[in-house]
Amino acid sequence: MAKLSKRLQAFAAKVDRQKLYAIDEALSLVKECASAKFDESIDVAVQLGIDAKKSDQVVRGSVVLPAGTGKSVRVAVFAQGEKAEQARAAGAEVVGMEDLAEQVKAGKLDFDIVIASPDTMRVVGTLGQILGPRGLMPNPKVGTVTPDVATAVKNAKAGQVQFRVDKAGIIHATIGRASFEPTALRSNLNALVDALQKAKPATSKGVYLRKVALSSTMGVGVRVDQASIAAQ
């Protein structure tokens, strides 16, 4: 831990916490800090100008990152008949109905995302106490309850990320890995910001995107000049 602490202290000394860095410089700094022995994730935190306590200002959605996430995703799908076959053909690892529900109840949750056809919600709805706390409960707002299960599976495999504002009004998301080229990370960040703009609540007043900061898994935060994101 001592070496890690010294490394972070040395990096933190390079970062001006009050400065807004242009996106290219911010990405360079964050990638420089990502010197752990594993491929660190590159994460973004976006402070939104909303009141998260108001139900009509909860920002939630999903976006397919053009350069992917760098993570392989296991997908489970609740579907039957033709839709079940379509889900399997699209690459879903687990497809079922009552049998899949029993697997979930038994604690066998070896998947990262759950997708459901609308006609299966009578079964899926009974699993809320298990799937909900794990962030796995299908929801139409993020595209995981849909009649087009094949496209949903393909999106999940292609690098779709879900986002939801927390109680402090902040969106947290991963936009790639330290091994990604800066151009890939930049395009992913642009896609996320575009999705957040489209999800802006009608009742949100004033500045909507207030602060943007980047960091690696083991690194420190680097604030980003939003104008440099818009300029890409």
From Swiss-Prot:
It comes from the Bacteria. CDD domains: Ribosomal_L1. Keywords: Repressor, Ribonucleoprotein, Ribosomal protein, RNA-binding, rRNA-binding, Translation regulation, tRNA-binding. GO terms for biological process: regulation of translation; translation. GO terms for molecular function: rRNA binding; structural constituent of ribosome; tRNA binding. Pfam families: Ribosomal_L1. The keyword Repressor applies. GO terms for cellular component: cytosolic large ribosomal subunit. Binds directly to 23S rRNA. The L1 stalk is quite mobile in the ribosome, and is involved in E site tRNA release. Belongs to the universal ribosomal protein uL1 family. Part of the 50S ribosomal subunit. This is Large ribosomal subunit protein uL1. The gene is rplA.
